Every structure is written in structure tokens, then in C-alpha cells.
């Protein structure tokens, strides 16, 4: 087949068309495109060019070699039975030889050309030398030119390919058999080695048994010798331990002596430094002398110089006589030409930090001094011929040894003033200010510095800065309270009244105090912790009245922690209730004794035995039954059993022997806290030890302050408060947390540092918890459905009520509606609270507080809802109703009727219509339906329209026939049943 175009010729030659075009152009054949036609003459020119380029000019070729390559795949299973795909590549090479004319004539019945035997095909792993492009072109062009070479038959190709595949398969099988044989031989060798190892182990075990049997006799003999050696060795060890203990004691004594020596040297150096500072602080007077001739100075005796060398390097204040002698020697050494030499010169042995700069500091001008006292030792310092004095003075300064630099380890707290930094380094405050000015900070001597800045300044001045760990406040209190002898005296018991709501706790205290507190409580329930102390014939008793409502769990827990005795109030007509059980748990957790007061004993339906049995079930056993809890039946109206109750309380206190120091710094507990508009932060505290006085520095949690005023429970001013006395204090910087411990410190700066540290630590902990919660719930929030949020802002009158209300509201959260507490604080509602509510779209709740005029106006202008409550029940109930309105309504089905399809007909403009008979109830337009076929629901949809006697109707009742058109559904049959229902939305509640 002759090639007519360049592309066909390139395909026939199995060459790149671009390469063929380049070769054609080089051969002088002008072909520019692949579609250009090629003639036989063009092919001859290309062949001649290629032969010439490869060094062959003979056109007469006697032999042509054809190379053909084919690729195939075979699948063969290996030894494991897994099928493997093998790539097989077959290469064939055939050579065609052109015979001479004589040979053609001699050939008998032979063809015009004969081909040699095909060479063995090379497998894919062998590499054949590729034919040159010119030879390929010649191989393709020669048959075209001569027309005598026969084409390679396809049958021969297939036969050769199959032979090659068979050969490869046979080789693969032989290789696999060899591998299997090698593995089998290796396994047999391994098994043989294992058997030999087992035999050797058995032989070794037998030998060992024989050796052990032989050695057992030897061991019996050696045991006695070993016992003797052990006894001697133990004695040697005891001697070595005694020697080591003696050496250790000697070393410890030596270290103690060294430490004492260092301490003595340090105290001596500090005393010398203090003496020098006092000397330098004393103003000096210039010595004015008349200029008169003096005899030349005499050389200083050697013993004096030796004495001076002995004191070199130490800070010694010169004696008065020595100072005068030195001054006289200076005056004697200065001649008439050295004016001003009579001035008292500062000692060169002082520290360099106290030495003035002679080039900048002006000296006092004396008689005959024309230099103005400046640079008396420079080139203008005196007349000619007197340079020896300056040289002598310069030599004296050079010979004086510099003061030894002492590196101080400075402990830097959280905040420290400039003066304190200088004091810790024993330098002037001006040096610290100068160093800070070099760092770009303008500070004053009393300005506080942060820890990082102070440490940098200390390092800049050549000392070592160490972060001072903030001491434990308890350690501070112990340091302040610890005295040589603190006398402990008996104190009054602190009694907490606990029990269920409406069981008569406050009424019982009212009768004891002869007051009427219960009548003034909102709703008749206690919502704050009340603290009182009462004088009885047998002594004083302090009472804590805790709320009984379930929301005030934290208040009851604080009351149990601060108390000595718990009075458990149980109503005789009500028995043990949930808050009664909770109070018992708090008392047992605090480890305080319980005195049971069964109130309302005068009521007709009182059942004391039932109350006792219920309390026994809560592990509170009365004394009558062999327990340790006295039971007293009381009545707050008639006073029945009140004296017996107090008698039991005081008897229990006597048994406990309650004592506390009186003449000491006060410690106690914050019972309640609030923010008063006129008085500021106010805290009700219970003094547990020591005496609290007006003017004391108080540290309570994260707040501190100086006590400005104290009031007792009746509102009267008080100057002091001893142990077990509750008082109300003013003067704190912020409202403390209820339940915090308070203590009195002697240093206000220390109290400020501790409060600041606690606030920062609390803030960091809170932020860390919030971040952890965000990271923990981020995926849950992404996967969960949309949850409705109800943001609220809570402002209350006291800390305990705010805490209780916030916790109660947060407990109302569900999976669908959550309460988001934006802000909760103590005090009146301010404009900042309203602005926060506007930004967060929150509801503002005021508990026993009101909004000021500016806040009310701002709330009305921006539509912020303000809700005021005085009873915690009302706040919780109203918020529960609001959250119920945010819940998605419940979808509920209500069946309204059924119908039977008796006929089915089709209208041209309407479609399929079900002729139905209403068997029960009724059906109306747009009602929902279920299609039942053989009592199986096959479709649920909506009624499109209803017709009766060709008229559209809204509804059809039981016993009537009608035509019903179903919306988007027409697969209905006679005998089907239709069940009609409506979906009603039912409001949900929490």
C-alpha cells in the first residue's frame, strides 16, 4: 500500500510527523503540511538524503530487515493461588534478501524473493538496538520500489505470539517450582534445627539437674559460713553508718557555723553602710583658712599606711582625731601657690556611687582661689611649678582600691513602687528614675511599676531579679496574728436555724429576739441570711437565719459552714420535706451537732411521733431512742419549749468548749453583701476569732478596704466586734462574694496586692474555663438544631439573692430554650445595664431593686422590658411562662370523620372525583385525609374541593353523599375508605 500523504507515510514508518517534515525539508522536498501529497520521486529523494547522511550511497540494497513488536497480557496463578497479570512483549525480526538475476534463473519454481528464518523473539526484559530512521525508511521504501517482497502473514504472527506465550508460561512455572522447592528445603532445615535445639536443651537440663543435686550438699556446708560472713558484714555496715552519721553531723555543724558567720558579716556590713549614709546625710561646712606659708609636708610614716591598708575594702567611718590630722596634713602639704587646699576633701575610700564628678561638680570657692572652685586639679588649678601635688593626688586615687560590687537578689512582687525597688537594691531612688528615663519612661518616686518593668530595671542596674511568689493570705494572717502569747477565751456559740420553707424558722427567732422580722419579709418567706446575737440568762448566743426555699441552697451551705450548732426546724403538721433533708446533709457534711425543734406543736393536727419516725429514717436519732440529737417541741406563738431549746443549745456549747482569741486580728466569714446607693459596698460579716475594729484593713476574697463604719444587727453604730458577733461593715472597694473568708491585715499595700492577685487569677481561670467550654461544645453546637435563647440581666439587692435567683433561672433551661445569663450583679439598675440589655436584647430583672430615672427613660425609649420582683417564686414562675411561649407548639391530630367511596367518575375539566358517602363525623374543604384500601393506608393528602348536587360546599356532615376531589391524587377505587382529620397545635409548657 503506497502512502499518498505525509501523515500516512509517517504512520507507515511509525515516526513522528514533525520529524518526517523536518527530514523532507532537509532532503529538498517542499512539504509544509501533513496533508500534502507525496510522490514516488519524493520518497526516492528522501531515501537518497537519508543514505547520504548515514554514509551509504549505494542505492542497490540486497537485504531488508523488518522488526515488529506486539504486547499482550496473560494471567497466571502463583503458589498462593493468587492470580497475577504478566505483561508479555514479543519482538520479531525478519530479513528479506533480494536475489541476483542468475540466481533467479536458477531457482526452480521459487518466488521472486526469499526470506530468512525468523530470529528468536526477544522478551520484554531484553534490550534491542533500535533501527536508525534511515534504515526504517529504506525498509519501507524498498518493497514499495521493487514490489517483490511478500507481506508478513498474520497466521505466522499469531503462531509466533502463542509460542512466545507458551515459552514464558513454562519459564514462570519452572521459576515457581524452584521457589517452592527452596521454601520446602528451608522449612525442613528450620525444623531440623529446632529438633536439634530441643535435644540439646533436654541434655542440658539433665546435666543441670545432676549439678544441682551435687551442689545441694555443698550449699549446706556453705550456709553456715555465709551466716558468719553476714554477721561480720552487718557489724561493718553499722560501723560505717555511725561514721557517716558523725561526718554528716560535722558537715551540718560546719554549714551552720558558716551561715552564722555570713549572717554576722552581712549585719556588720549593713551597720557600716547605715553609718556611712548617716555621715553623708550630715551637711559639711567648708573650712576657710588664711593663706600663709607652711613648711613642706613630712612623709607619712609607714605604720599609718599599714593601718590604712588593713582597713582597705571595708566601710569604716574615720575617727574625729584622724579626720583632723588628715585635714592638717592636707593643709601642710598645700603651699602658697595652691589655694583652696584647706578644703576638706571627701574620702576616696567611700563607695564610688557616692563620689561626686570632679569635672562637673562645683566646689566651694576659698580665699585666693581664682578658678571659682571648678577643676582645681586641672591645668588651670594652680600656679606653675606646683604640678607635683596634682600628680600625688592622682596617684593616691589610683592606689585606692575600688569598692567591691555586691550583686543583690531582688524579689519583685506583682506591683512595686520606684522607692521600694531602690530600697531593695540599697541605692538611691534617683538612680532608678534615671535608669527608667533611659528606657523612655518618666516616673516619680512613688509611682507603682509592674513586675516586668521592675525586673528589667533591676537587671539593668546589675542585680539579679527574681519573681516573688505571692504568699498565701493565711500565712500573712498567721504572721500578723502570731504573737508571743495569745490568750484564748470562751466564746458564744454560733447557731444556724435551718429547715423547710414555711416551717417557722424566722418566727422562732422572732420570739427569741422579741422582734417581728417575719412580718417584714416579702411574701412571708426569708430570702436573706439574717445574723443576730441574743443575750440569755446563761450567756450570749448568735443566730443565723437561713432561707428555706429550694433556690437558696448556697445560702444554707454557707450557714452550715459558719456555724457551731444547727437547729433543725421541722413543722409538726408537715413532717420532713425536701429542704429538711438538704439541711440534714449540710449539717452532717459540716460535722456540727443537730438540735431538732419541732415547731407548731400547739396545732391540733400536730403529730410528734410521725416526725420522729421520719427523722430516724434520715439518720437523726433522738436522745429518747439512744441517739445524740435532742428533740424539743416548741411553739412560736405561745412560747412553749423555747427555754428548753436554748438550754439544750447552751448545754451543747458547753460540751464543745468553744474558745477563740480576743486580743488578736480578726478573722471571719462574709455572710451577706450588697451595694447600697448611699453607703457603697456593704458586707455582713461574722467574726470568728479576734476583734474587729473601726479603721482595720480588711481583706475579703478579691476585695479589700479599711473599715469606715460598723453597725450591729439593730442598725446601731459599733466600734468593736468580738468573736461570734455579726456586724455590718462599710469601706470595701467592691462588693465581696457571700461566703468569702475575711481577715484583718496590718498593711494596706499587702491587702491590695493579694486582692489584685486573686482577681487576676479568678479572671484567668474563668476565661480558661469559657474557652475550654467553647472548644468542647463547638461541634455539638454545629450539629445540634437551632436552640432559642432567652438572654436575661439580673440585678438584686444582696449577693446571696442574686446568686440564688441566677441559679434558679439557669435551671429552667431545656434542649429547645436556654436561659443565657448575660450579667448578674448587686445594686440598682443603671443606664449601663440598659445599654447592655439593648446590645444583647436581654430582659432586665430587678429583685428588690429599682431602676433610676435615667435608666427608666432609656429603657422606655428603646423598648427594654423591666421586671421587678420581691419574691423569688414570682420571678421563677413568670420566666417559666415566658420560656413556655418560646417552645414550638405540639402538633396533634384530631379525626373529624370518615367516608366510603361508592363510585368513581371522571370530569373533563375537574379530573377524577370520588363519589362518597359520609359514614361518621363530617368533612370540610382543605381537610387532611388518609386513603385506606383493605384497611391499609395507601396515601395521605388534602381535600381539594367538595360538591353536592353540582354546587361547591364548605362541608358535608354524616349521612349525606357528596363528590370529593382529592388534591394531586387520582388513584382511587370503589370500596376505598377516606379518614378525615385536622392538625391542631397544642401549646407546650415547661
From Swiss-Prot:
GTP binds at residues 499-506, 545-549, 599-602. It comes from the Bacteria. Residues 524-528 are annotated as: G2. Residues 104-116, 131-151, 223-243, 281-290, 318-342 have a biased composition (Low complexity). Residues 599-602 are annotated as: G4. Residues 499-506 are annotated as: G1. The keyword Manganese does not apply. Residues 490-659 form the tr-type G domain. It is found in: Cytoplasm. GO terms for cellular component: cytosol. PROSITE patterns: G_TR_2 (PS51722). Residues 92-402 are annotated as: Disordered. PANTHER family: TR-TYPE G DOMAIN-CONTAINING PROTEIN, TRANSLATION INITIATION FACTOR IF-2-RELATED. Belongs to the TRAFAC class translation factor GTPase superfamily. Classic translation factor GTPase family. IF-2 subfamily. One of the essential components for the initiation of protein synthesis. Protects formylmethionyl-tRNA from spontaneous hydrolysis and promotes its binding to the 30S ribosomal subunits. Also involved in the hydrolysis of GTP during the formation of the 70S ribosomal complex. This is Translation initiation factor IF-2. It comes from Verminephrobacter eiseniae (strain EF01-2).
